[in-house]
């Protein structure tokens, strides 16, 4: 991935690394950057433009249905709902919005007590506006709580709207889905994550290298929250963003090591490939960490297309076995053996 350099913030490859800049967090508490730079308006949200434009229509017209926003973590689901509530309610936001995290408040008592009591409260709002109940991680709610919520949504439909954020909409019962407009968010692209990172870097005056930004984007995998947390953690710990510092903070198998291991497999050199695997294993990385990074590196590895297909098929098969609980070093070594076998010259009989 190409990363554009920006003024004095970046460092040319080959230049001497500057001495670490002491973090601004020293000596006093600083707000996490995830909260500090959380968008407050819908047009500030990065990515998922089509879905956000639908929310902007809701905000303009004021007639909001119950909504479910489903998508991966760190894509802006909860932030979008809060921006919508702010656009609709303005100064009344504090009194007219109840925000609950359903992964904590997941039982039927929450629906019967907190949600029902809030829905019954009288709040003075502009004409055509409704109170909003935000349920984050709604797919963690028990079936009993969801059944109780269905009836509550019907009874208080004249005064209250429900906004649910979840990772998987299929874990929300059908009766609730049928009462809501379902909006889907996708993972953010590398370019979208990079644009927001550069915005924060410029405001916080963070020194960085291109490979450091690539490392943050690689570890984030389309999760903006993860990217900003990794950026702040690396800056707080080292005062300088480069790939070495990022992987010290994130502590996952280094993609350069994984890339070298895949190259040995392409060269059918099982001994050297196994040495790298054993090294990663002895560092304490789990099979899930290793197999996940093997897949992510393999996707962009320069090799023949037919070979890449064969490699990914074997990686997927091994990932399935690891997920089933067969997560020994022998299982991972078997993957390397099968990958090497794909590129070995046939033995003459």
UniProtKB/Swiss-Prot annotation:
Region annotation (Disordered) ranges: 1-27
N-acetylmethionine, modified sites: 1
Keywords: Acetylation, ATP-binding, DNA replication, Nucleotide-binding, Nucleus
Presence of the UniProt keyword Nucleus in the record: yes
Alphabetized Gene3D superfamilies for the sequence: 1.10.8.60, 1.20.272.10, P-loop containing nucleotide triphosphate hydrolases
Database matches in InterPro entries: AAA+_ATPase, ATPase_AAA_core, DNA_pol3_clamp-load_cplx_C, DNA_Rep/Repair_Clamp_Loader, P-loop_NTPase, Rep_factorC_C, RFC_lid
GO biological process, one term: positive regulation of DNA-directed DNA polymerase activity
Function description: Subunit of the replication factor C (RFC) complex which acts during elongation of primed DNA templates by DNA polymerases delta and epsilon, and is necessary for ATP-dependent loading of proliferating cell nuclear antigen (PCNA) onto primed DNA. This subunit binds ATP.
Known partners and oligomeric status: Subunit of the RFC complex, an heteropentameric complex consisting of a large subunit RFC1 and four small subunits RFC2, RFC3, RFC4 and RFC5; the RFC complex interacts with PCNA. Forms an heterotetrameric complex with RFC3, RFC4 and RFC5; this complex has ATPase activity but is not stimulated by PCNA. The heterotetramer of subunits RFC2, RFC3, RFC4 and RFC5 interacts with RAD17. RFC2 also interacts with PRKAR1A; the complex may be involved in cell survival. Interacts with DDX11.
Protein name: Replication factor C subunit 2
Species per Swiss-Prot/TrEMBL record: Rattus norvegicus
Name of the gene this protein is made from: Rfc2
């Amino acid at each position: 991935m190409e990363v554009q350099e920006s003024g004095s913030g970046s460092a040319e490859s080959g230049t001497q690394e500057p001495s670490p800049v002491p973090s601004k967090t020293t000596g006093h508490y600083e707000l996490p950057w995830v909260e500090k730079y959380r968008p407050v308006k819908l047009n500030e949200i990065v990515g998922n433009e089509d879905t956000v434009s639908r929310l902007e229509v809701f905000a303009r017209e004021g007639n909001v249905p119950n909504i479910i926003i489903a998508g991966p973590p760190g894509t802006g689901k909860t932030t979008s709902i809060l921006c919508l509530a702010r656009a609709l309610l303005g100064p009344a936001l504090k009194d007219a919005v109840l925000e609950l995290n359903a992964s904590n408040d997941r039982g039927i008592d929450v629906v019967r007590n907190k949600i029902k009591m809030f829905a019954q409260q009288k709040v003075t709002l502009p004409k055509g506006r409704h109170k909003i109940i935000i349920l984050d991680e709604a797919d963690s709610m028990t079936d009993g709580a969801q059944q109780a919520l269905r009836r509550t949504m019907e009874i208080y439909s004249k005064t209250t709207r429900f906004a649910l954020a979840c990772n998987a909409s299929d874990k929300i019962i059908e009766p609730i889905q049928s009462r809501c407009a379902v909006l889907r968010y996708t993972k953010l692209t590398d370019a979208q994550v990079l644009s927001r990172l550069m915005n924060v870097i410029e405001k916080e005056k963070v020194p960085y290298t291109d490979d450091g930004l690539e490392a943050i984007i690689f570890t984030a995998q389309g999760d903006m929250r993860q990217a900003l947390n990794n950026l702040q953690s690396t800056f707080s710990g080292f005062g300088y963003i480069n790939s070495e510092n990022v992987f010290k903070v994130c502590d996952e198998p280094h993609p350069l090591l994984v890339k070298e291991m895949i190259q040995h497999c392409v060269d059918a050199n099982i001994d050297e490939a196994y040495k790298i695997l054993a090294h990663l294993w002895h560092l304490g990385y789990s099979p899930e960490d290793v197999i996940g990074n093997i897949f992510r590196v393999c996707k962009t590895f320069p090799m023949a297309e037919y070979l890449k297909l064969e490699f990914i098929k074997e990686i997927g098969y091994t990932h399935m076995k690891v997920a089933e609980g067969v997560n020994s070093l022998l299982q991972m070594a078997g993957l390397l053996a099968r990958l090497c076998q794909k590129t070995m010259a046939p033995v003459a009989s």
